[in-house]
Amino acid sequence: MPPLPELFANNRRWADDQRARDPDFFARLASQQQPRYMWIGCSDSRVPANEIIGLPPGEVFVHRNIANVVVHSDLNCLSVLQFAIDVLHVKDVIICGHYGCAGVRAALSEDRAGLSDNWLMHVRDVARTHRRLIERLPALPARQNRLAELNVLSQLANVCHTTVVRDAWARGQEVCVHGWIYDVHDGLLRDLGVEISAHETLMPAVESAFARMEASVPG
């Protein structure tokens, strides 16, 4: 890991490079933020939101936690979601999980992870609910990847069930919720094919995604 003084030097170079490319960048950024996107992702250091979608500061409003979980009792996450939708008026909310997620791996195993076990119970609940879809896959890495995908769909549904999103839809605000997965092995995002812009479309879209997963397993 770089020593701390080097981080300040890196920051100076980054700021100088930004000003060289766009002299008004920081003045414009300081005046206000108008992100179109909200990103709910994993805290994993290999999955930095802005970098993997190629957007500069000011374009994405980000909330991250272990295994990209959305819980209706988590005031941290709900406050970020409410600010993004009600104040910033973001149009797209992206729930992005990733393959190789340590939280998902721990949730699928019987190993204890300490305090975070309590948090990962939410992911273990997803694994129990969809055990058949997971256990149809013979190899452990494939099962872990499948749980990462199922977890995204579950958290997407949780977002859509929040009063924040449902109230926005009720007043006619344009909000679309997306489920994506990121592969740390090749750096590519994959769309899980679920985009929800009205509450009544949620369950049909999620059930269709489950059916596609079922059909993707031979035999």
Language model segments and positions:
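N-terminal short beta-loop-beta anion/metal-coordinating cradle
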Residues: 18-59
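Divalent-metal-activated hydrolytic enzyme cores
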Residues: 1-35, 67-91, 102-219
